[in-house]
């Protein structure tokens, strides 16, 4: 029902825009509204708002325009976009992650960017082609990175008699057994099943799912999580919880970085950018664990988009180019978030500890697919696995009930 309401509202706003003009920007063709995601750490010297306001003010001064910046909190991110777009009070330029694209493209809410970039400009972006989604250049990849990796507290492993970071599922379970046997009070593997947002699946579910050989959808866009491979991954997580590897209450944690940084856990999957904020712990990492079929993990592929309601698309495209210039991106990656370059001219300035992620281990990195009802499907799956962790569902029920829900309500 939620999905049907979303589609209906988007239809209404697209129809209304034919008569009402350009929504949030209609007051002036020299005004742009920019919505960005929060990426700076909570204790950062420069906030996201401060950074992008400075960029926007410089652009405005050079182009005789005004750019209004708003940072959208993650906990209300999708709702904010939905409300803004359907009420003609959304941005001219926004930041979408893959789960959000299908419906906005399907209903004509996003502008095709291709005509605003010359061939020379396109060649300056490392991942320009990844922005071609559902037959149009609706995105300009902006954050292609932040892989989810497994961190290991090497001092805890030494106490447990484990001399190397596990690289396979079997090695992980053996190491967890050793931690439980030799390190009282330590959680072997901390997972944030208490986090309210399904984005945690990127760290604590999809790496196992893909490494078991699972596929979220097939080439026709049909949901395929209820497969032998999907069950093997879900059963593996369930078994780890049952063995006590995840602590006494797997749904109590909502941020794995806290217990890991406090030395309370031997292992934790987290974004590479968050890992660099872990101080005071002797940690090493593995990019992905070898499962029954493969070794794969999640990598972000978030993008900048221009909304069709924007009145001055030429100006908006110019702002996007300014935001993604080598100069701006270098400063952004050094000041706000440690990510790999998105342009050919930007040098990698991130931690050498993770330099191999995008070279030697690049074939292990995988993004989420774009398909109908993705966000709602992920939310339903996440809640089902939370119920499994509470003993309310079996692994088989998680996959079957989620698939039935998707096919009945979202497909």
Where do the PLM segments sit?
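Conserved C-terminal helix/tail region of periplasmic/extracytoplasmic solute-binding proteins
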Residues: 158, 181, 239-242, 362-411
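Extracytoplasmic "Venus flytrap"/periplasmic binding protein-like
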Residues: 61-125, 132, 155-167, 257-259, ...
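Hinge/lid segment of periplasmic solute-binding proteins
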Residues: 98-148, 173, 183, 201, ...
């Amino acid at each position: 029902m939620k999905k049907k309401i979303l589609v209906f509202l988007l239809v209404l706003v697209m129809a209304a825009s034919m008569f009402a003009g350009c929504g949030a920007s209609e007051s002036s063709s020299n005004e742009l509204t920019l919505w960005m995601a929060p990426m700076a750490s909570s204790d950062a010297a420069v906030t996201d708002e401060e950074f992008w306001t400075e960029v926007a003010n410089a652009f405005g001064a050079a182009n005789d325009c005004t750019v209004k910046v708003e940072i959208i909190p993650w906990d209300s991110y999708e709702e904010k976009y939905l409300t803004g777009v359907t009420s003609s009070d959304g941005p001219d330029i926004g930041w979408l992650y893959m789960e959000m694209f299908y419906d906005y493209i399907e209903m004509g809410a996003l502008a095709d960017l291709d005509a605003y970039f010359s061939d020379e400009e396109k060649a300056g972006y490392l991942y320009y082609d990844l922005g071609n989604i559902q037959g149009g250049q609706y995105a300009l990849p902006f954050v292609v990175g932040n892989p989810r990796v497994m961190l290991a507290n090497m001092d805890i492993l030494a106490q447990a008699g484990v001399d190397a970071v596990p690289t396979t599922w079997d090695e992980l379970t053996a190491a967890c057994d050793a931690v439980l046997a030799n390190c009282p009070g330590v959680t072997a593997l901390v997972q944030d099943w208490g986090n309210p947002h399904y984005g945690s699946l990127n760290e604590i579910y999809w790496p196992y799912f893909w490494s078991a050989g699972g596929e979220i959808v097939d080439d026709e866009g049909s949901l395929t999580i209820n497969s032998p491979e999907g069950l093997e991954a879900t059963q593996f997580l369930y078994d780890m919880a049952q063995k006590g590897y995840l602590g006494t209450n797997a749904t109590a944690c909502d941020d794995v970085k806290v217990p890991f940084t406090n030395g309370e856990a031997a292992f934790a999957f987290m974004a590479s950018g968050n890992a660099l904020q872990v101080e005071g712990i002797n940690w090493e990492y593995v990019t992905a664990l070898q499962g029954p079929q493969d070794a794969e993990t999640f990598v972000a592929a978030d993008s900048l988009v221009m909304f069709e309601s924007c009145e001055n698309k030429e100006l908006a495209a110019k702002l996007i180019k300014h935001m993604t210039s080598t100069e701006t991106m270098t400063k952004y990656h050094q000041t706000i978030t440690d990510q790999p370059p998105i342009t050919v001219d930007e040098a990698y300035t991130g931690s050498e500890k993770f330099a191999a992620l995008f070279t030697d281990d690049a074939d292990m990195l995988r993004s989420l697919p774009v398909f109908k009802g993705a966000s709602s499907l992920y939310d339903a799956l996440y809640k089902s696995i939370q119920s499994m962790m509470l003993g309310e569902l079996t692994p088989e029920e998680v996959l079957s009930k989620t698939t039935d829900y998707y096919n009945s309500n979202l497909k």
